From Swiss-Prot:
Superkingdom of origin: Bacteria
GO cellular component terms attached to this protein's record: ribonucleoprotein complex; ribosome
Species the sequence originates in: Borrelia hermsii (strain HS1 / DAH)
GO BP terms, alphabetized: translation
Ribonucleoprotein recorded as keyword: yes
Protein name: Large ribosomal subunit protein uL29
Length: 66
């Protein structure tokens, strides 16, 4: 999963992060309202969002070069 994120461009990472956030929010609402088929999916999504945030922040502070 991490290797896949490293291959994306900065704009693609930001778009992917937004999509993952929407998916995470939908999953949270489903968990509150009813049954979730895969409860571990929330953890995976949270961690993927954190990974993308880290990579995007590294570009912002100059650790990674575009």
């Amino acid at each position: 999963m991490l290797k896949k994120f490293k291959d994306l461009t900065l704009e693609d990472m930001k778009a992917r992060r937004l999509a993952l956030r929407k998916e995470y929010m939908d999953l949270r609402f489903k968990a509150v309202v009813g049954h979730v088929e895969n409860p571990l999916k929330k953890r995976e999504l949270r961690r993927d969002i954190a990974r993308l945030n880290t990579i995007i922040h590294e570009y912002a502070i100059g650790i990674r070069k575009v």
